[in-house]
Swiss-Prot record:
Name this protein carries in UniProt: UvrABC system protein B
Listed InterPro entries: Helicase/UvrB_N, Helicase_ATP-bd, Helicase_C-like, P-loop_NTPase, UVR_dom, UVR_dom_sf, UvrB, UvrB_inter
GO biological process, one term: SOS response
Highest taxon in the source lineage: Bacteria
GO molecular function annotation: ATP binding; ATP hydrolysis activity; DNA binding; excinuclease ABC activity
Species annotation: Staphylococcus epidermidis (strain ATCC 12228 / FDA PCI 1200)
PANTHER family: UVRABC SYSTEM PROTEIN B (PTHR24029:SF0)
Chief location: cytoplasm
């Protein structure tokens, strides 16, 4: 039975500006069973806070889809803060590294599947699916990996092992049930998905938990006591009357179903081998027979094999070609989907199926997989549409799909800080570089920063060199720069190490810098992906965090995309100015803390940064050890909170300290 728990939003802020009307409109739309709604939220208007308020008012389990792991991690941290008493879960691909199996016919090269699974993310995925069967106050932040195949939710739910104090059950029966749901006995290396036995006591480490295991104590053939225990220290956390243990794998199957599945795989193998031999593809037939029989033997003996997901259509006893089960099937009948940055996320969802199919087809043609492997796939876009009943798209620049399916946009244009969309100035390209240099110099004199966006890598490099020769402190941001370096460059821009950053695509997350008062768009009239109306609006938004924000477009003609972006920005500005005038608000630049690589032991302003870099050299051995321990604690906490950027920064600091020790 799913427990009903209301959503409790914790925040020191109340909805402001046009947040209250946006929240009310979306809540009304959900209650009226509207299928599609779009929240058009300008940069910096607090879209996440609006989404949180909608979830609280509507009270439905909610899936929030982001277009990459970094964004999903940021959203997860924010929603955890907003809903500390509710189940906020994280569901992304559990691969730190993933090389899918592939075959290159031209060189006769088979690339074996190679993957590194992140155990913590696997635990979070199990936590997400089990939460959906236990409570209804669930928010799952997911990447596009939520449309990839998962086991049958009914089977997953029906195979739970339920233990209750006073229940008649022999110890051996519990052990058998645990093995049936993919738990393995390990009395020495006790970890997630295992159990250990000590006399009449069975300790089980659920796949969905991080540090807590369940201790079940027997008296004869009866369960005498159930306790939650810290698996490392043995400290008793609390007594339980009842506990539900969910399977250790999402691809779990009953023994009788496994027998039927194996028969189905054997039948398909027989048909496919005949087909290949008739076409005189003897090498492919031999390869397929050998690989499949090995997998079947593993399934008979272990109930599992490497790459078992490729047989998912048989394991779930579905017809060939049918829609796979995904995370979406684990939700009940009444739930909500929110798609963040929908103008990027929806095309990503749409494109997943074709890319996956092309790779698998080559494997099937050359005898590495059975044709049914095609059914272990992401959803087609039409299937995604069928499975989702109510959607809210969230974007500053909604795409064609959202515009086509939404009758009326819910606008959120007013920022709580009173900040306006920037002024836009279009200038001719003649003498643009000299004009640009004088504008940058003007900002440098006022201790402000500049972003310059170009169209090509070569132009970015040449411009950076030219600006350096002109005495401007500048750096070049491009796709080859690693995440950590990227964070450092942005931090250095904020701290004044650089006056300007030159780049090609400055739309990516993490470029919201309050110190930036000028955004320069070169070749604004060259139509294309980087100069489309949506890209221009997103780029213009980078100057909307500063009360002196301005955008200069260098162009010899005004394109349709430019005109749309200029008109839309002006429309928003007028609404924002009117609101500020009515409420007596003075726009104020956001004061955003600068997160530093060395923020663990000393506050990260410039003075402290200098102190910190000198600190390791002055420390005694004891002080250094203490500092290392503090940083290690903070690093583990950051990783646990999914603040991976901070964790990486702290890790590098540790290396530095240890090297100097």
């Amino acid at each position: 039975m799913v427990e009903h728990v209301p959503f409790k939003l914790k925040s020191e802020f109340e909805p402001q500006g046009d947040q209250p009307q946006a929240i009310q409109k979306i809540v009304d739309g959900v209650n009226e069973r509207k299928r599609h709604q779009t929240l058009l939220g300008a940069t910096g208007t607090g879209k996440t806070f609006t989404m949180s308020n909608v979830i609280k008012e509507v009270g439905k389990p909610t899936l929030i889809i982001a277009h990459n792991k970094t964004l999903a991690g940021q959203l997860y941290s924010e929603f955890k803060e907003f809903f500390p008493e509710n189940r906020v879960e994280y569901f992304v691909s559990y691969y730190d590294y993933y090389q899918p199996e592939a075959y290159v016919p031209s060189t006769d090269t088979f690339i074996e599947k190679d993957a590194s699974i992140n155990d913590e993310i696997d635990q979070l995925r199990h936590s997400a699916t089990s939460s959906l069967f236990e409570r209804d106050d669930v928010i799952i932040i997911a990447s596009v990996s939520c449309i990839y195949g998962l086991g049958n939710p009914e089977e997953y739910k029906n195979l739970v092992v339920s233990v209750r104090v006073g229940m008649e059950m022999e110890r051996s029966e519990l052990l058998r049930k645990l093995v049936d749901v993919q738990y393995s006995r390990n009395d020495i290396d006790f970890q997630r998905g295992t159990f250990r036995v000590r006399g009449d006591v069975v300790e089980i480490f659920p796949a969905s938990r991080e540090e807590m295991c369940i201790r079940v104590e027997f008296f004869g053939d009866e369960i005498d006591r159930i306790r939650e225990v810290n698996y490392l220290t043995g400290e008793v956390i609390r007594e339980r009357e009842h506990f539900t243990i969910f399977p250790a794998s999402h691809f779990v199957t009953r023994e009788e179903k496994m027998k039927v599945a194996i028969e189905r795989i054997e039948k398909e193998l027989e048909e496919r081998l005949k087909e290949l031999r008739d076409e005189n593809k003897l090498l492919e037939a031999q390869r397929l027979e050998q690989r499949t029989n090995y997998d079947l033997e593993m399934m008979r003996e272990m109930g599992f094999c490497s790459g078992i997901e490729n047989y998912s259509v048989h394991l779930t006893l579905r017809p060939l070609g049918s829609t796979p089960y995904t995370l979406l099937d684990y939700f009940g009948d009444d739930w909500l989907v929110m798609i963040d940055e929908s103008h990027v996320t929806l095309p990503q969802i749409r494109g997943m199926y074709n890319g996956d199919r092309a790779r698998k087809q080559v494997l099937i043609d050359h005898g590495f997989r059975l044709p049914s492997a095609l059914d272990n796939r992401p959803l087609k876009f039409e299937e995604f549409e069928e499975k989702t009943k109510q959607l809210v798209y969230v974007s500053a620049t909604p795409g064609p799909y959202e515009l086509e399916h939404t009758d009326e946009m819910v606008e959120q244009i007013i920022r709580p800080t009173g900040l306006l969309d920037p002024k836009i100035d279009v200038r001719p390209t003649e003498n643009q570089i000299d004009d640009l240099l004088s504008e940058i110099q003007d900002r440098v004199d006022k201790d402000e920063r500049v972003l310059v966006t170009t169209l090509t890598k070569k132009m970015s490099e040449d411009l950076t060199t030219y600006m350096k020769e002109a005495g401007i402190k500048v750096n070049y941001l491009h796709s080859e720069i690693k995440t950590l370096e990227r964070i450092e460059i942005i931090r250095d821009l904020r701290m004044g190490t650089y006056d300007a950053i030159v780049g090609i695509n400055l739309l990516r997350e993490g470029i919201d810098i309050p110190e930036v008062s000028l955004v320069v768009i070169l070749d604004a009239d060259k139509e294309g992906f980087l100069r489309s109306d949506r890209s221009l609006i997103q780029t213009i938004g980078r100057a909307a965090r500063n009360d002196k924000g301005e955008v200069i477009m260098y162009a010899d003609k005004i394109t349709d995309s430019m005109q749309y972006a200029i008109d839309e920005t002006q429309r928003r500005r007028e609404i924002q100015i009117a609101h500020n005038k009515e409420h007596g608000i003075t726009p104020k630049t956001i004061n955003k803390k600068i997160h530093d690589v060395i923020s663990a032991t000393v506050e990260s302003d410039e003075t402290n940064q200098q102190q910190q870099t000198e600190l390791p050299k002055k420390m005694t051995k004891k002080e250094r050890q203490k500092t290392i321990e503090n940083i290690e604690k903070e690093m583990k906490k950051a990783a646990k909170d999914l603040d991976f950027e901070k964790a990486t920064e702290l890790r590098d600091m540790l290396f530095e300290l240890k090297a100097e020790g």
